[in-house]
Amino acid sequence: MAPSLEEPTAANIDALSKTAPNLVAPEPEHCPGPESEQAGKGDACAGCPNQNICATAPKGPDPDVAIITERLSQIRHKILVLSGKGGVGKSTFSSLLAHAFAANPDSDVGIMDTDLCGPSIAKMMGVEAETIHVSNAGWSPVWVTDNLGAMSIQFMLPNRDDAIIWRGPKKNGLIKQFLKDVDWGELDYLIVDTPPGTSDEHLSVNSLLKESGVDGAVIVTTPQEVSLQDVRKEIDFCRKAGIRILGLVENMSGFVCTNCGHESTIFRATTGGGKRLAKKMGIPFLGSVPLDPRIGQACDYGESFVDAFPDSPASTAIKQRSNGFGVYGMEKCDTIFKTADLADTREY
């Protein structure tokens, strides 16, 4: 089908899905897992690029997992924010979500930046120049407000523009320190902002948090197929890793003029967008967040967009539950996520 700027029809979308290529080769089967005694030694490991790493890695349960579980036992809800591709607004959404939770003065909120090579949460929260303080209780998070704390590698850099050039083991070690040593105290919500894709950081966070209990993951996308194709991989990763998918959020879904209120489509959903994908993959669609240039300005200045522009359509989408995902004054994550929009079967 030739490229076109016209709105795609349902027939065109179905035709695209039918012609989608299959994997050239099936994925490896019967992997014993990195913690197994047979890791790197079994017949299924032959030819695997990670065979030597698995064979030489220490086996058995990680003793730090019990320490992390105890440390995080006072946190009621832990939410991962994932994206298949960079640039879809995952960290922006994480910061908006944190501010929206913290808008309830009775809620205590933490946000942890595990995107070690591209940390942006400190900047978005307006605390980029702060440093970590260490006490007998552990590392103290940087408090943005009385009920909103943040933790990021940015607080540890000698110079704010220093690059992080680390391999997997060193990244995993710092993530473990964030989970084991940071003294969050009692929190209602801990939001974990992750790097794009499915990398070492995701595996580390999942394995270290599994015992302490994670509510699940929110996946952020934009409407274009180039983003959705990576979301499918992210969904596959979550299912294989045993991470509950709370739902899909479509960011930058359109632009609403602040003067006349007219909504314009910026990134056309050539294959049906996030809602169609969520329906097809059997996960909740949590709603859409429109573009607003003031979001970028608020993030650059480290201000809460939700507080500064409470009547913006984007703020409304975050606060008042767009298609089943409401965060403003939320009492329990499960109550909201269980009522997310799985039943809407409209075609796009």
Curated annotation (Swiss-Prot):
GO terms for molecular function: 4 iron, 4 sulfur cluster binding; ATP binding; ATP-dependent FeS chaperone activity; metal ion binding. InterPro entries: Mrp-like_CS, Mrp/NBP35_ATP-bd, NUBP1/Nbp35, P-loop_NTPase, YlxH/NBP35. Pfam families: ParA. Binds 4 [4Fe-4S] clusters per heterotetramer. Contains two stable clusters in the N-termini of nbp35 and two labile, bridging clusters between subunits of the nbp35-cfd1 heterotetramer. Keywords: 4Fe-4S, ATP-binding, Cytoplasm, Iron, Iron-sulfur, Metal-binding, Nucleotide-binding. ATP binds at residues 84-91. PROSITE patterns: MRP. [4Fe-4S] cluster 1 binds at residues 31, 45, 48, 54. It is found in: Cytoplasm. GO terms for cellular component: cytosol. [4Fe-4S] cluster 2 binds at residues 257, 260. Component of the cytosolic iron-sulfur (Fe/S) protein assembly (CIA) machinery. Required for maturation of extramitochondrial Fe-S proteins. The nbp35-cfd1 heterotetramer forms a Fe-S scaffold complex, mediating the de novo assembly of an Fe-S cluster and its transfer to target apoproteins. Heterotetramer of 2 nbp35 and 2 cfd1 chains. This is Cytosolic Fe-S cluster assembly factor nbp35. It comes from Aspergillus terreus (strain NIH 2624 / FGSC A1156).
